[in-house]
């Protein structure tokens, strides 16, 4: 486990009509994070089975914290600590986010984030606390052997963007966090 990464497992109430749950409470996010997180934008992406997006992050002054959840389908979500001064530098966590389990993953600034789609398709929503800046965007190779990430790819067929195919391994990455 990496203490700064927070997995929210909301309780939801089901009955004959369907279900209800609080999908977002700013005060609970702030309390769990230990500081005021100011989400300013919400993004949504839809991907098909085998699509791998990651491992992405942005440098200051556009670094981003994220709150990620699956609206449809399921993904294996991965987060890597890329803060050089951290005791958990280079370590990662993985968890399955599904539309059914309604888990949400809080990813603070200073971490690389990515996911692979496990279901036929998946729709992911993520709130961010800073705007996208292409000049500040960076990535880490998803298949960096030193990280030892198990992507649970049974057939080794993945779909990557050209940009993600060219990300450096962590050891060769110059632009990280202190």
Language-model segments: residues:
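Short beta-strand His + acidic residue motifs that chelate non-heme Fe in jelly-roll/DSBH
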Residues: 105, 113-118
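Non-catalytic, conserved peripheral segments adjacent to functional cores
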Residues: 1-100, 119-121, 128-178
